[in-house]
Amino acid sequence: MKLRRSRKQVTFALVCVLTCLSVSAILAQGQQPNRGGADQSPRVFLLNAARLQASRSAINQSDKDIQAAWAKLQRDAQKALDEGPFSITSKAVTPPSGDKHDYMSQAPYFWPDPKSPNGLPYIRRDGERNPEINKITDHNSLDKLEAAVETLALAYYFKGDERYASKAVELLRAFFLDPATRMNPNLQYGQFIPGVNTGRGIALIETRGLTRIVDAIGLLEGSKALTTEDEQRLKDWFGKFLQWMLDSKNGREEAAAKNNHGTYYDVQIVSYSLLVGRRDLARQTLEQARQKRIATQVEPDGRQPLELARTKAWSYSNGNLDGLMQLATLGERVGVDLWNFETKDGRSIRKALDFLAPIAIGEKKWQYQELGGIKPESLFPSMRRAAFVYRDKPYQILMGKVPEVDSADRSRLLNPNLPASAKQAQR
């Protein structure tokens, strides 16, 4: 009888221990995301999960085609471990609000008027950057954050080294979450013109790189460093910024832009909408982009008139093409095909690329202005992306004709040469 009671007591004790362990595991899952590790397919929108997985396999197999790019990424990530944290609150100038948590920047192409005693109001000199803008450091802090976090997140995904994830999350917390150093989710005082205004909608072009942060969050989801609380608070920040873009005077002003500014406004709206679960808004924006962005910005022969009118016509044409391609990539996430959209008179993303490609490979000369001269290699990432989409066009061959392309160009990792067995992988 005593033996039976003893066995029952032991059994009961074991059940209690196992129950406690199970509860502890559940609580731990509440603190850390239960979304798989770096070996899982990442939640990304502008990047392509299938291609990232292909690159990781190629890295593990020491594929020579991407080794230079992988080595460069590792060097960049190692350097990023010692950078930051970054914050806009460290600037020496205070915005009109009196709050250094508000982003602030000065219009780069505006200079003192030599005919005015005090130089005011500033006047426009397109394409010529006024070094005075560097007195306000917010745009530099933002650029450094975007580059470092993306680099660290990619390195973590490819290698699984938690050091990279930990540093990336540290930078994200400092810039977006820490009450002492966080940025307020608005650009009310971005790109002000001395003597004219305190801020403009055009400043939203400066946050186009935040879409890289959105994908970086997805790459970090499997890490030990990014908690579910972190992720939710980041989503809350982007949700507020998205709403500010939709409701504010500056946001509405940028939405109405008919050039690259309008394109990148849409890219941001869609990316942030997908992050916070507003898929209907993302789909609506993309459907409207057919006419609002592609049909109105691209001519039947592929020219982009509003970009060609600039003093850096090549850079702006290439940059807007990249933005249109980003919209098309985002369209894949919600079933809106912009890659193959074409108006009755032939306006399309493809035509815009085909207009620039002959210049990049040296078959034609650039007939428009470009301060400092064109850089043909800048079109390489777009051509590489097109090689995956338009398989009936020899963009893979054309890429080999673009001069001065760095073998360590990151696009080789983001859009790798897939092996024959993977040619039908999802775009």
Regions flagged by a language model, labelled:
Residues 25-31:
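Signal peptide processing junction and immediate N-terminal pro/mature segment
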Residues 13-24:
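Bacterial N-terminal signal peptides
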Residues 287-308:
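Flexible internal linker/loop segments at domain or repeat junctions
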Residues 1-8:
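N-terminal secretory signal peptides that target proteins for export/translocation
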Residues 31-254, 263, 287, 298-299, ...:
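Extracellular glycan-targeting catalytic surfaces
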